[in-house]
Each structure stands twice: as structure tokens, then as C-alpha cells.
């Protein structure tokens, strides 16, 4: 896939899954990713805060091999060098990480650059500085980070969709029970962490979320 084809996945009611071993009920990231990919997910973000860089490299390399088999995208959280080394499709950076222009210069034009945003100002700045997609949240209360940002609510999704012309990935506390609220406010790409990785049956949970997204895309309410 070229970059344009890859970015089209962010605009087509797809599920964007992040790894989080702390919440995966003792299961390894690689095993969680395998189940998620088997269920049909096309976008994976490798986010791992606690392991050594060697451990992250070894794990990300295996996940890259898996995503390639499934023709899925691999986005690396934070680490530009790791993204480049394992030949990921992109990197996701936060407000306090490397500037977008630095990431672009280091990784090249074909890499996807995603940026976390919490406010309207940050959304506009991300667009103006050349982010390929925006992670917008947390929409609802979320506790996967040590210092969670307060929830920003649903209305900003609709505002962002109408004010910038790059994909918006809604993230933060999104679950099967509230996903319709997020979709109704204009989100076309939904990120989930604990709703997926903490499920007893990751495959079935993921399949059900995908079914909801596809149903919404096709104009059917399957709730």
C-alpha cells in the first residue's frame, strides 16, 4: 500500500487497536495482537512504556512481521528510531514528544505521523504542521496513562471533523457501550485499548466491535 491507501483506512469506520500489556490479563502483547489481527483489525499501535529498548525492539519486530502477514498497519508510539528500524508504517507522538517537523525529517515522507491532541488549538496546530492524522481524546475518562488528561467530551469530535481535513481518531474510554455516541459525533476511526485487551475473549470482542462499525457504516443499527 502507498501512503494514501494506508491513510484511507483511518477514514473508513475502522478500529484502531493499541497494545497495553498491563491490562491484558497476563497475555503477551504478541499474542494479543495475533488475536486482534485474526479478528480483522487493520491498524495496530505498539505502545509499551515499561520494557527496555531491546525488549521493545524484539517485540515490535515480531509484531511488524505479523502485521505484514495480515496487510495491516503498524504504528509505533513515541519512538522514531524504533519505527524506522522495524520498518513500521508510522509513528504516533504526543504533545511533549518530538515536533512533527523533526519526525518528518527523520522518518521521511512515506511514514505516517500521528499526533495526540486534547484541545481545538492543538487540533488546528497539528493540521497546520503536517500531521497525517490526529488522535483526539480522551473522549471519556481513561486510566491507561499514569497522568491521565481530563476527558474532553464528544462535541469536539464533530468540531474537529468539520475544521481539519485529515483523519480524526477518537480515543479514550471508548467501549462497546458508548461507541454509538462517538460515531454519531462524526468519528470514522475508533481507538480502543482496555475494551479489547482486557476482554476474556479478545477475538470475539474485536469481531463484535468491527461488526458494529461496519453496521454503522452501512446505515444499520446493530446495537
From Swiss-Prot:
Alphabetical keyword list: Magnesium, Metal-binding, Thiamine biosynthesis, Transferase
Binding positions for 2-[(2R,5Z)-2-carboxy-4-methylthiazol-5(2H)-ylidene]ethyl phosphate per the UniProt entry: 142-144, 173, 193-194
Protein name listed in UniProt: Thiamine-phosphate synthase
Family under the similarity heading: Belongs to the thiamine-phosphate synthase family.
A UniProt-annotated Pfam family: TMP-TENI
One example of a Gene Ontology biological process annotation: thiamine biosynthetic process
Source organism (scientific name): Dictyoglomus thermophilum (strain ATCC 35947 / DSM 3960 / H-6-12)
Cofactor note as given: Binds 1 Mg(2+) ion per subunit.
Catalytic activity annotation: 2-[(2R,5Z)-2-carboxy-4-methylthiazol-5(2H)-ylidene]ethyl phosphate + 4-amino-2-methyl-5-(diphosphooxymethyl)pyrimidine + 2 H(+) = thiamine phosphate + CO2 + diphosphate; 2-(2-carboxy-4-methylthiazol-5-yl)ethyl phosphate + 4-amino-2-methyl-5-(diphosphooxymethyl)pyrimidine + 2 H(+) = thiamine phosphate + CO2 + diphosphate; 4-methyl-5-(2-phosphooxyethyl)-thiazole + 4-amino-2-methyl-5-(diphosphooxymethyl)pyrimidine + H(+) = thiamine phosphate + diphosphate
InterPro entries referenced in this protein's UniProt entry, alphabetically: Aldolase_TIM (IPR013785), ThiamineP_synth_sf (IPR036206), ThiamineP_synth_TenI (IPR022998), TMP_synthase (IPR034291)
UniProt EC number: 2.5.1.3
Coiled coil: none
HAMAP family, per the entry: TMP_synthase
Obligatory cofactor(s): Mg(2+)
Purpose of the protein: Condenses 4-methyl-5-(beta-hydroxyethyl)thiazole monophosphate (THZ-P) and 2-methyl-4-amino-5-hydroxymethyl pyrimidine pyrophosphate (HMP-PP) to form thiamine monophosphate (TMP).
GO cellular component labels: cytoplasm
Pathway it works in: Cofactor biosynthesis; thiamine diphosphate biosynthesis; thiamine phosphate from 4-amino-2-methyl-5-diphosphomethylpyrimidine and 4-methyl-5-(2-phosphoethyl)-thiazole: step 1/1
Keyword Transferase on entry: yes
SUPFAM superfamilies for the chain: Thiamin phosphate synthase
Amino acid at each position: 500500500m502507498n501512503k494514501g491507501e494506508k491513510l484511507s483506512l483511518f477514514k473508513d469506520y475502522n478500529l484502531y487497536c493499541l497494545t497495553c500489556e498491563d491490562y491484558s490479563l497476563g497475555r503477551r502483547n504478541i499474542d494479543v495482537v495475533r488475536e486482534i489481527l485474526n479478528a480483522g483489525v487493520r491498524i495496530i499501535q505498539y505502545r509499551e512504556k515499561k520494557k527496555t529498548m531491546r525488549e521493545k525492539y524484539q517485540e515490535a519486530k515480531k509484531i511488524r512481521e505479523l502485521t505484514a502477514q495480515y496487510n495491516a498497519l503498524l504504528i509505533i508510539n513515541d519512538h522514531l528510531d524504533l519505527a524506522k528500524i522495524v520498518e513500521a508504517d508510522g509513528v504516533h507522538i504526543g504533545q511533549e514528544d518530538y515536533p512533527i517537523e523533526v519526525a518528518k525529517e527523520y522518518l521521511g515522507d512515506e511514514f505516517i505521523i500521528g499526533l495526540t491532541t486534547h484541545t481545538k488549538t492543538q487540533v488546528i496546530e497539528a493540521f497546520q504542521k503536517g500531521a497525517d492524522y490526529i488522535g483526539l481524546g480522551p473522549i471519556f475518562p481513561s486510566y491507561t496513562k499514569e497522568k491521565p488528561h481530563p476527558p474532553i467530551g464528544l462535541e469536539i469530535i464533530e468540531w474537529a471533523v468539520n475544521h481539519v481535513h485529515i483523519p480524526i481518531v477518537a480515543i479514550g474510554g471508548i467501549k462497546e457501550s458508548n461507541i454509538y455516541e462517538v460515531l454519531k459525533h462524526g468519528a470514522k476511526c475508533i481507538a480502543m485499548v482496555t475494551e479489547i485487551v482486557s476482554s476474556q475473549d479478545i477475538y470475539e470482542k474485536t469481531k463484535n466491535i468491527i461488526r458494529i462499525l461496519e453496521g454503522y457504516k452501512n446505515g444499520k443499527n446493530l446495537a
